Amino acid sequence: MDLEVKELCALDINIYKCITENIDTDRVVLTNKSVIHIADHHPDAYNDVLIELKDTITSPDFIISDGKHENTGLIIKKIESSEKTDQHTFIVLKICTNSQNGQLANSIISGWKISDKRLQSYLRNKQVLYKKEKS
């Protein structure tokens, strides 16, 4: 299988430098490998996650540290379009610290939905790197 890469959006480096100061590009990509992973491992969330990806990256509600993987953040945003009012998009984003002259980019690793209860647990038990200010 060839690795297909889709340019998704640009991230705000000022927001995402909470993950690492060493962000080499603002480009965010989604590979077919990640799309297949989301479809296989999170089929109930697949459509919502793909619809909400760009908005979640460009305007996150929270960024939480991924304690297991360096230069990786857990990006969370409330799903406004959901019938369920307590659903949030949860995206794993790997930050690119060496784009090799623009050939590499920040990439979506996975994504799924979490409940408000799960979000509250993450906020209590994990390191919150960023919280969107209420306007």
Give a label for each model feature.
Residues 1-135:
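Ribonuclease/tRNase effector modules and their secretory precursors
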